[in-house]
From Swiss-Prot:
The active site is at K166 (proton acceptor), H285 (proton acceptor). Binds 1 Mg(2+) ion per subunit. The basic functional RuBisCO is composed of a large chain homodimer in a 'head-to-tail' conformation. In form I RuBisCO this homodimer is arranged in a barrel-like tetramer with the small subunits forming a tetrameric 'cap' on each end of the 'barrel'. Heterohexadecamer of 8 large chains and 8 small chains; disulfide-linked. The disulfide link is formed within the large subunit homodimers. GO terms for cellular component: chloroplast. GO terms for molecular function: magnesium ion binding; monooxygenase activity; ribulose-bisphosphate carboxylase activity. It is found in: Plastid, Chloroplast. The modification N6-carboxylysine is found at K192. Mg(2+) binds at K192, D194, E195. It catalyses: 2 (2R)-3-phosphoglycerate + 2 H(+) = D-ribulose 1,5-bisphosphate + CO2 + H2O; D-ribulose 1,5-bisphosphate + O2 = 2-phosphoglycolate + (2R)-3-phosphoglycerate + 2 H(+). This is Ribulose bisphosphate carboxylase large chain. Its EC number is 4.1.1.39.
């Protein structure tokens, strides 16, 4: 007589549980599942739940040594996607104990690990995650958050202005610092290292940090405003990254920057902890996000990457523009912008928000609009993003025919004009162009 029946059995017998009541401590996921032809959606949904939690392809002897009921992921809901053939939203609940505390890395290894290569699925996309309060409380989150940043910078009641220094590659450190100075002197709050600028032969990081710090102090002295430059600390190893952050702090720089997807969540969380301990703000760039989030039916939606970043830690994150050169729909973008900034966000499917998310006093992140925007977009941007945002004009500053400083002046003047017009109750959508024309006289 055998102890148990080996062999392959349907996942749905164990992992499809439509009657399950979700717990407040569960991590909930909404997956867009495209099963292979002939695979029923229940089986596909259950397969996702199994493969991203306790399951393997057969019953194993060691299952008897643990409580599956306590540790298994469960597919508790399925709905067909309107307008798509053979696509379903599968809702999966994961018990909290499956995840290491304070580790975005571990959360993703489970939820979006092997399961994405699964044979029974043609494609799989993680659309949203509900992160329970009990798990959020194990994370530090953003080093400082929106309010503390405003207090540090002494800038209130308007979006902040930035500019990426171009040409992104090829300038010497001295000329790079000069461009930084001109932009800050003209009226921007921040300038930015491009995400590709790390420490290349034509400009080593230490030289760049030095000349940028000089530019910041000079511009501060002349304008009486606090200025910053996002010093990109991204590096090939975590140790080197922290070394760069330490040097930035020694120079008295207010903010450093990290590419969180190429750098990885482990490195990012380390840097975020360092930044909080040492009073540095942290600007996050999302290079590589489109590799993960651009396909509609496979990968994961950017709102998930944004939530993960808020847990891992960052004070600014690039979030699309709605109007510039890169893709992004307005309502959907505003959905994850709110997920970054607000304390509590209600479920709202029209904005792509599948779950109500409570952030319980985890600091907020400023969304950064960047990529192909310029001064004529200013009315739309102030209206769409509101005060709590950073508007970044790279070519839209440095492309000014009179040079960098006048480009910076133009952006600052346009911003102040739009904010004032809005505060006076004028309709930015309708009168935007007129407001800008008046301002530039």
């Amino acid at each position: 007589s055998v102890g148990f029946k080996a062999g392959v059995k349907d996942y749905k017998l164990t992992y499809y549980t439509p009657e399950y009541e979700t717990k407040d401590t569960d991590i909930l996921a909404a997956f867009r599942v495209t099963p292979q032809p002939g695979v029923p959606p229940e089986e596909a949904g259950a397969a996702v739940a199994a493969e991203s939690s306790t399951g393997t392809w057969t019953t194993v002897w060691t299952d008897g040594l643990t409580s599956l009921d306590r540790y298994k992921g469960r597919c508790y809901g399925l709905e067909p996607v309107a307008g798509e053939e053979n696509q379903y939203i599968a809702y999966v609940a994961y018990p909290l104990d499956l995840f290491e505390e304070g580790s975005v890395t571990n959360m993703f290894t489970s939820i979006v690990g092997n399961v994405f290569g699964f044979k029974a699925l043609r494609a799989l996309r993680l659309e949203d995650l509900r992160i329970p309060v009990s798990y959020i409380k194990t994370f530090q989150g953003p080093p400082h958050g929106i309010q503390v940043e405003r207090d540090k910078l002494n800038k209130y009641g308007r979006p902040l202005l930035g500019c990426t220094i171009k040409p992104k590659l090829g300038l010497s450190a001295k000329n790079y610092g000069r461009a930084v100075y001109e932009c800050l002197r003209g009226g921007l709050d921040f300038t930015k290292d491009d995400e590709n600028v790390n420490s290349q032969p034509f400009m080593r990081w230490r030289d760049r940090f030095l000349f940028c710090a000089e530019a910041i102090y000079k511009a501060q002295a002349e304008t009486g405003e606090i200025k910053g430059h996002y010093l990109n600390a991204t590096a090939g190893t975590c140790e080197e990254m922290i070394k760069r952050a330490v040097f930035a702090r020694e120079l008295g720089a207010p903010i450093v920057m990290h590419d969180y997807l190429t750098g990885g969540f482990t490195a990012n969380t380390s840097l975020a902890h360092y930044c909080r301990d040492n009073g540095l703000l942290l600007h996050i760039h999302r290079a590589m996000h489109a590799v993960i989030d651009r396909q509609k039916n496979h990968g994961m939606h950017f709102r998930v990457l944004a939530k993960a970043l808020r847990l891992s830690g960052g004070d600014h994150i690039h979030a699309g523009t709605v109007v510039g050169k890169l893709e992004g729909e307005r309502e959907i973008t505003l959905g994850f912008v709110d997920l970054l900034r607000d304390d509590f966000v209600e479920k709202d499917r029209s904005r792509g928000i599948y779950f109500t998310q409570d952030w319980v006093s985890l600091p907020g992140v400023l969304p950064v609009a960047s990529g192909g925007i310029h001064v004529w977009h200013m009315p739309a941007l102030t209206e769409i993003f509101g005060d709590d945002s950073v508007l970044q004009f790279g070519g839209g500053t440095l492309g000014h025919p009179w040079g960098n400083a006048p480009g910076a002046v133009a952006n600052r003047v346009a911003l102040e004009a739009c904010v004032q017009a809005r505060n006076e109750g004028r309709d930015l959508a309708r009168e935007g162009n007129e407001i800008i024309r008046q301002a530039c006289k």
